[in-house]
Amino acid sequence: GMMALGGMSYLTGVYLQSVLDMDVLAAAIAGLPMACAVAIFSVGAAKVAAAVGTRNAFVGSVVLTAVGMAGVLTLGVDDGLWMYMLFTTIAGIGFGVQFSLVSEVVVGSVPPERSGAASSISETCFELGTALGLGLLGSLATLVFRGGSDGREFSDTLGDTLRTADGLGASGDALVAAAKVAFVDGMHTAALATTALLTVVAVVLAFVMRP
């Protein structure tokens, strides 16, 4: 879950600002529905688990996250803001339930005197997942981005490429268009990989986790 959140949050943040040309404040506001979903369902995760069972809550949350990540595939170069807000909110519901239940299960599986250590391990895993998501998914997206240059002089990142294009005047328009398309292709590839991984996780949880 944290791999998906860390990696895709970074990529979609770049998408909003560099592809859709939104400023930082507007991009942050676009992310509020997801943040609210995470907060609300983190608080309500225990009630969800009590209603449907812990295993079903876990599996359902991972499925929702996978649906949200799959929705990133609908985002295009020229539009995608509303679809972004819709699908990241869906993913946020899944993230909220997952994060709360993971901590609860980890702490609840050890004696009370070891709950502090268990909680620390859980937090460390969250941080590690975020770092892995940024590294692996970011690298995958960058690989696809650079591969989509078709001989054009792309810089290492989309932002650097756009700045280079700005200095070329009218002749840089084609470079801007190609760079944005290549970045979206990279983001889509990362989203597809994330969706596939989450789907596998959901299936495994459904079979190996106790109700």
Regions found by a protein language model. Name each.
Residues 1-145, 188-194, 198-201, 208-210:
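12-transmembrane solute porter fold
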Residues 23, 143-195:
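A membrane-interface helix-boundary motif in multi-pass transporters
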